């Protein structure tokens, strides 16, 4: 993945999360396991910076799903979980999520959070099916209140007008 080679105009990398799940119902689970293993190996190694030092990249964020097949109880993919733990001990990531708990809370469904740790509130379509993908999550919005205050030049009415304008952009 080459997400870390992309930059915005202010020097930020795109906020991307990789949801690393080994689903027994996935017909390509073994191939998926190879991909998850390689992503973890690359993260464990780190990315070489300008000084030649391997550092921990902030993105993509990694979320590793613990399930019956990889929860260190003799499952087929326990070796990948051990790699994930090594990776976390050195690079702070991946974060972990329990498929068992998600299934309990969401009628058997397991799905990725958006961005860092933001979960959309549950929503079902007209057929009563959960819809987790393709939905928008605005997430966190920052407002620069000191800037609004400076622009208002002490005029409380102008402050509230500017604040209302900025808030309108948020949604």
Could you describe each region identified by the protein language model?
Residues 1-171:
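Conserved catalytic cores of very large enzyme subunits
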């Amino acid at each position: 993945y080459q997400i870390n080679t992309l930059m915005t105009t202010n020097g930020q990398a795109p906020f991307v999360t990789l949801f690393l799940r080994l689903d027994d119902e996935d017909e390509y689970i073994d191939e998926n396991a190879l991909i998850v293993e390689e992503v973890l190996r690359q993260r464990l190694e780190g990315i070489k910076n300008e000084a030649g030092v391997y550092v921990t990249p902030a993105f993509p964020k990694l979320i590793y799903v613990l399930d019956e097949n990889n929860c260190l109880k003799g499952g087929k993919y326990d070796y990948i979980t051990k790699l994930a733990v090594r990776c976390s001990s050195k690079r702070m990531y991946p974060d972990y999520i329990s498929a068992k708990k998600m299934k309990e809370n969401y009628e058997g469904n397991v799905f990725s959070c958006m961005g860092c740790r933001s979960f959309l509130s549950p929503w079902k379509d007209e057929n009563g099916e959960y819809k987790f993908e393709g939905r928008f999550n605005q997430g966190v919005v920052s407002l620069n209140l000191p800037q609004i205050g400076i622009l208002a030049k002490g005029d409380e009415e102008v402050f509230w007008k500017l604040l209302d304008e900025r808030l309108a952009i948020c949604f």
